[in-house]
Curated annotation (Swiss-Prot):
Pfam families: NHase_alpha. NHase catalyzes the hydration of various nitrile compounds to the corresponding amides. One of its GO terms (molecular function) is cobalt ion binding. This is Cobalt-containing nitrile hydratase subunit alpha. The keyword Glycoprotein does not apply. It is an enzyme of class 4 (lyase). It catalyses: an aliphatic primary amide = an aliphatic nitrile + H2O. It comes from Pseudonocardia thermophila. Industrial production of acrylamide is now being developed using some of these enzymes. Keywords: Cobalt, Lyase, Metal-binding, Oxidation. The modification Cysteine sulfenic acid (-SOH) is found at C113.
Length: 204
């Protein structure tokens, strides 16, 4: 795995993917299956209408509004709808809260079920067989070795297996020292990885 298959050459992987996508895009346009305007619209959707920035919006709302947090943990899909967030791959979302006693991490062992509306497209490592199998067997060791995140021995780790029926999202703990911060400032601390559970929200 870590030659680093999880974290390994994100740049290299990205270059390969970009080249393949461009080749496929050109072929589909040439065959009249897609148009450039259709492709631009899809890019706009994934840039502005779904993605981690929307997940961060949900997290910050939960950090700053206790009543919203209760609703989010009770029914994540409906609570997200309050913020205008939902849609494809977001029909059934369950949010699980990190606390001083327990840390949650998400995987999809069968395929790559993933809450697109709040996290965007899944990172490559999330779909790797090595991540999917190892996080179930030895989550503490994997988080430390692959993501540089050491969960204290006293803290329980729970692994949640997403499926087409239920997609899990982690509500990270709010970092200390952020009292009085604006929602915009708090949102900068929330990462896609922290909502999957492979790292905490950014420290202040």
């Amino acid at each position: 795995m870590t030659e680093n298959i999880l974290r390994k050459s994100d740049e290299e992987i990205q270059k390969e993917i970009t080249a393949r996508v461009k080749a496929l895009e050109s072929m589909l346009i040439e065959q009249g299956i897609l148009t450039t305007s259709m492709i631009d619209r899809m890019a706009e959707i994934y840039e502005n209408e779904v993605g981690p920035h929307l997940g961060a919006k949900v997290v910050v709302k939960a950090w700053t509004d206790p009543e919203f947090k209760k609703r989010l943990l009770a029914d994540g899909t409906e609570a997200c709808k309050e913020l205008g967030i939902g849609g494809l791959q977001g029909e059934d979302m369950m949010w699980v809260e990190n606390t001083d006693e327990v840390h949650h991490v998400v995987v999809c062992t069968l395929c790559s079920c993933y809450p697109w509306p709040v996290l965007g497209l899944p990172p490559n490592w999330f779909k790797e067989p090595q991540y999917r199998s190892r996080v179930v067997r030895e989550p503490r060791q994997l988080l430390k070795e692959e993501f540089g995140f050491e969960v204290p021995p006293s803290k329980e780790i729970k692994v949640w297996d997403s499926s087409s029926e239920m997609r899990f999202v982690v509500l990270p703990q709010r970092p200390a020292g952020t009292d009085g911060w604006s929602e915009e400032e708090l949102a900068t601390l929330v990462t896609r990885e922290s909502m999957i559970g492979v790292e905490p929200a950014k420290a202040v």
